Amino acid sequence: MCPPVRQRPAQAPPAKRQALETVPHPQNRGRLMSPKARPPKMQRRPRPPVAKRRRFPRSPQQVERPILPPVESTPQDMEPGQVQSPPQITAVIQLRQERDTMRPPIYLPALLANCGPAGLLRAHRLPQPKPPCLSRQRPSPDSQTSPC
């Protein structure tokens, strides 16, 4: 009688096979190894890309867009005999940036409005503004000057 035919053991599914191949079992091989602190470079996961910060922020010309007035005439309103002409824009087109530099906004203090950005640097050297005088609201007829 011939010896029984040796068959190959059934293969493990691919995920388990990969785990078995990559994870060393040094005890089975007869030697003890401590696991590596860092896997080699090819097995390391790549870092996600970091959002790039701009060294110089964008200038207002790149950020701001011109404010266009709404176009009043549309091609559907035109009569068939009338020749279509380019729409007449009567409003002045301004960039927001230009409008802001012409006149300071209302909410800025008067010091900044009068002296510009240098006023903020000189603000600590100037005397404190006096509180509004209450006697000016009710001027008496006999006194010409206010006590404050």
UniProtKB/Swiss-Prot annotation:
InterPro entries: DUF5451. It holds the Pfam family DUF5451. Belongs to the Epstein-Barr virus BLLF2 family. Residues 1-17 have a biased composition (Low complexity). Residues 38-57 have a biased composition (Basic residues). Residues 1-86, 122-148 are annotated as: Disordered. Residues 137-148 have a biased composition (Polar residues). Keywords: Early protein. This is Uncharacterized protein BLLF2. It comes from the Viruses.
